[in-house]
Amino acid sequence: MNMLMVLTVNMMLSTCLILIAFWLPQLNLYTEKANPYECGFDPMSSARLPFSMKFFLVAITFLLFDLEIALLLPLSWAIQMPNINIMTLTSFILVSVLALGLAYEWLQKGLEWTE
C-alpha cells in the first residue's frame, strides 16, 4: 500500500511539474526575451545560433561516459560487503561495456573534431 501511494504521489507531482513547464513559458511571449542580453546595447546577431552537430555529438558522448563513470562511484563502499565476487564481476562488466562503447565511438570517428 505504501509503495502504491509513493508511486501515485510521484506520478502526480511529475505530471504537475511537466504541465507547469509547458504552460508557464507561454504566458509572456514577446520578442525581447528571445534577444541576448548585451549590457544594454542592441544585439549584434541572433540569439538562436545553431550548434555544430559534431559539438552536440561530443557533448552527448561525454555525458553518457560521465554517467557510466558515476555508476562506479559506489564501488568503494561495496567492497565492504561480504559477497565481493558479484560486485567485482558487475564492475568488470560495466567497465567492459564502457571500453567497448569508447572503442565503437573511436572506430566510427565520433571523437574526431575535424573531418
From Swiss-Prot:
It is found in: Mitochondrion membrane. One of its GO terms (molecular function) is NADH dehydrogenase (ubiquinone) activity. Its EC number is 7.1.1.2. Keywords: Electron transport, Membrane, Mitochondrion, NAD, Respiratory chain, Translocase, Transmembrane, Transmembrane helix, Transport, Ubiquinone. The chain crosses the membrane at residues 4-24, 55-75, 84-104. It holds the Pfam family Oxidored_q4. GO terms for cellular component: mitochondrial membrane; NADH dehydrogenase complex. It catalyses: a ubiquinone + NADH + 5 H(+)(in) = a ubiquinol + NAD(+) + 4 H(+)(out). It comes from the Eukaryota. It is a multi-pass membrane protein. The keyword Hydrolase does not apply. It is an enzyme of class 7 (translocase). Core subunit of respiratory chain NADH dehydrogenase (Complex I) which is composed of 45 different subunits. Interacts with TMEM186. Interacts with TMEM242. Core subunit of the mitochondrial membrane respiratory chain NADH dehydrogenase (Complex I) that is believed to belong to the minimal assembly required for catalysis. Complex I functions in the transfer of electrons from NADH to the respiratory chain. The immediate electron acceptor for the enzyme is believed to be ubiquinone. Belongs to the complex I subunit 3 family. This is NADH-ubiquinone oxidoreductase chain 3. The lineage of its organism: Eukaryota, Metazoa, Chordata, Craniata, Vertebrata. The gene is MT-ND3.
